[in-house]
Amino acid sequence: MFYAFKDFEKKETLLIGLFKKSRLYGKAEEIDRLLNGQLSQLLKDGDVSSKKAKVSKIFTPSLQGVKRIYIVGLGREAEFTFEDAKQCFAEAVQLIHKDRKQELTVMLDSFVSEEVPAADAAHALAESCMLSCYEVQDYKHRSNVPDQCLQSVYVLTDHDLKEIQASLHVGQVYGNATNSARTLVNMPGNMLTAADLASYAAELAAKYEFECEILEKAEMEELGMGGLLAVNQGSEEPPKMIVLKYQGKETWDDVIGLVGKGITFDTGGYSIKTKSGIVGMKSDMGGAASVLGAMEAIGELRPEQNVLAVIPSTDNMISGSAMKPDDVIVSLSGKTIEILNTDAEGRLALADGLTYAKHHGASVLIDVATLTGGVVVALGTETTGAMTNHDPLYQQVRQAAEEAGEAIWQLPITEKDKKRVKNSQMADLNNSPGREGHAIMAGTFLGEFAEQTPWVHLDIAGTATTAQNSCFGPKGGTGVMVRTLVTFVERFSGNL
């Protein structure tokens, strides 16, 4: 889809970036000459905006073979960042996509600044193209008119073509993997059961030559996975413990464990959700989607790391056999848990997932989960909540998130918090100490299963979906944390 080259070839559609108080230069200046100074005159007359992410459209009948030029404002060059580049590309490409253009030539060097070298600009372009052109895969009857979409992007640059092509590939992989996670999150619960999620993971494993293990209910019972099994008690759909193993080193050490919550629909159980709260609970497997999206990118990029993905999956339903408040269950770790709230089910499944990842050699753990409404109250819908038992690991995750352009914010774990999750007359732990500090209580509970293993918890309840369309795509699943996880895996030093 992306092709880097040095010599300008006349294509129907061109995209140029324009900094504030800038003139046309390089390849853009060459095109201006072919247009007899039309672009520079429009710039001089103020008919083309350099305001950040503002897109101007110019028709060019005088330039044979080139029908339309899009110019996107980039703002001040000294303030232009990698995230700005992604936004500007996304705004422009989304408009070009809506105009049903199938080919595009991008003057890459017009987007280069001191903060954004050519390779980064190429990554931003490819990632933004994939994200901004994403469309929800719905189940509506369609007309017989075939959809037209952007098929080929030609990247014109004076920089090293091999380096630019490599960056375009990485950006495309990041975007595609994020979109894969979005599609999973958007799928209805009746079309994405735990078995369906396991089949998807198995297909991913076959494509990228991962080792794949799918534990069935009988095997879980034999191992004593009381957390996941308790959540599954009310369901007619069998649970699955999904395990993918990618070995990028000669020996199985310094293993990164990625654990994703795979609750394919959450009624809340007997602690049933409200009418407004239950709609949208098909997305309660957002953590699993993020982990699977990350594994797709890892399969494409083949980093020299060892990665273990663990996804405990089921739905949380109501029936005569469903778990009840006051029940006591025994987790895979051997720790007992008193159930005070059946809607605090994700942490039960994750408890077994974290333990299973440790049993299979995980040196560090990162769990991703749409875990609590409390994190949405605390941090809103743009920032993912994070908790940890190991600050050096958290700093690596934070740096990866910053590089990927995904906001996270650390919440505390205190000794008083630990006492609250241990406050039970009947068991080692309780699964819901109360509404106060709800997001913190959930993370603290998970920390009891990470134990001494370095661990970071990412609560994406507020960020896994969006209610607004944006330049990065339609409302629905966001694929949040896919890019953070992949960046973390690629950068992980192992020195903690």
From Swiss-Prot:
Active-site annotation: K273, R347
Record: residues binding Mn(2+) 1: D266, D343, E345
Gene Ontology cellular-component terms listed: cytoplasm
Documented EC number(s): 3.4.11.1, 3.4.11.10
Gene3D superfamilies xrefs: Leucine Aminopeptidase, subunit E, domain 1, Zn peptidases
NCBIfam families for the chain: PRK00913.1-2 (NF002073), PRK00913.1-4 (NF002074), PRK00913.3-5 (NF002083)
Protein name, as recorded: Probable cytosol aminopeptidase
Organism for this UniProt entry: Bacillus licheniformis (strain ATCC 14580 / DSM 13 / JCM 2505 / CCUG 7422 / NBRC 12200 / NCIMB 9375 / NCTC 10341 / NRRL NRS-1264 / Gibson 46)
